[in-house]
Amino acid sequence: MTSSLSIINFYIDIVQFIKLKIKEKNFEIGFFCENKFILNYLKPYIDNKTKKKKVLIITFENLNIFQNEEVSIFFFKTNFIRELVFLTLNLKYLYTSTPDLENSLFKKTKFSNCKYIYLQHSPVSLNLIYRENAFDHFDAVQTISSYQYLEFNEIKELRKLKGRPFKSKYLFIKETKKNLSIQPKKKLIFWLLHRGTQVFMN
């Protein structure tokens, strides 16, 4: 049964891959949103981008929550096709909150000069929760605090990286405040600390 399901998923992924290749030329910007948990952090950035551009999303989980015609989602289940998608990607920019580019099946494309931009899903120390080579292959890494900015510059110098840090707002906080505006501030702070602890433990 498991073998049959794997074969079915493989053929479904091939169809999805073909659809992706047909549509890809209509996009400059893409997001790799690995799962629903990461979507919580990337959605504010996706929403911002779709105000001006069409956005392509690559995911490993079903994320059918967007009602926006500017968003096209491609969901892949099998690792072979997932890696093939990354290796053949033809975009100008790919945003993600998944680290370890080139250290897993998440690879840089061989078919374009795509720029890879890392967006933070945690405000904690970069040295504390990530592998030492987690950001080696990104062209730009978001920092959402002065401490993260200094940390990445230290990492960059130590590992002789070409990628640059950039400061920007942590849009997840802004979105969370908006969604939880009816709750007392103490509950909001507790909730944010709890989510931060979850990220750290993962």
Spans of features found by a protein language model:
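An aromatic- and histidine-rich active-site surface loop
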Residues: 38-39, 96-111
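Active-site-proximal region of nucleotide-activated glycan assembly enzymes
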Residues: 71, 77, 93-97, 112-175
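Conserved catalytic-core segment of nucleotide-activated headgroup transferases in glycan assembly
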Residues: 37-49, 171-202
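Structural motif
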Residues: 31-36, 58-62, 96-100, 120, ...
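N-terminal pre-catalytic "stem/leader" segment of glycosyltransferase-like enzymes
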Residues: 1-90
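A short, aliphatic-rich alpha-helical micro-motif
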Residues: 87-89, 135, 183
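Residues that mark the start of a beta-strand
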Residues: 26-28, 115, 188-189
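Short, charged/polar "capping" segments at the starts of alpha-helices
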Residues: 38-41, 62-68, 103-104, 149-152, ...
